[in-house]
Amino acid sequence: MKQTRSPLYPIFLFVIINLIIFTLSRLGLAIWQADRVSAVAGWGQLFLQGLRMDIVALCYLFGVPALFTVLFHNSRIWKMILRIWLTLGSVFILFMELATPAFIETYDFRPNRLFIEYLIYPKEVFSMLMEGHLTAVIFSLIFTVVAFFCYWKLSGYAVRNLRPMSWKWRPVVALLVIAVAFLGARSSFQHRGVNPAMVAFSSDGLVNSLVLNSGYSVLYAAQQFKDEGASSEAYGKMDTDEMLRIVKASRGR
């Protein structure tokens, strides 16, 4: 069979699929919360900024594999790694969107740092889910498992018949991929890249959270946790009794 597909075909295919999933999920959530979206006249901003944040998320997720695909698309080992990356990344995106309605119903927000914090107490969370969202949990798990096999099969189709690229062009295309992924992930020419605060446009926290996608929201929260942990190390540790003694001494007690 002729090798007619661009080496980046698998990346483009999965980017388009996940953009569709993001958009359909956001549309469904917006229709569900239509009164609140309309109350802040947020329909246009919601989908415009939402598309922006989806592109940011996909550039972070698929930027690195796009680069390596340009360089090693003829390698069987890399094709297997790429299939795993495309499949697991897409399953994560789908699972987080499926988990979103139940989370919003409980916390009035997309999955965020609370999603991570409650993972520390899996028994309590599992009990709560079984009592209040059993149907949603079963549906999400079944759909996620089915999606895994579908994505895996689709990734196998996507990496077939890729057209070889001359080595003299690979560095050039690789630089273009780096530039596009970097600019897409930052989505801003300011000193700092885009973040949730930059795309918030209303006083309604839920509507602002709908601009994001749930995978990005959770991973951004995880990064904040990491940064908080790193910053706390600068202050060292102190025994509670010693801390109280110093405070009392400073107040003359």
Where are these regions (language model features)?
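Transmembrane and membrane-interface helices of multi-pass
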Residues: 2-227
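Membrane/wall-proximal cationic-aromatic binding patches
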Residues: 211-253
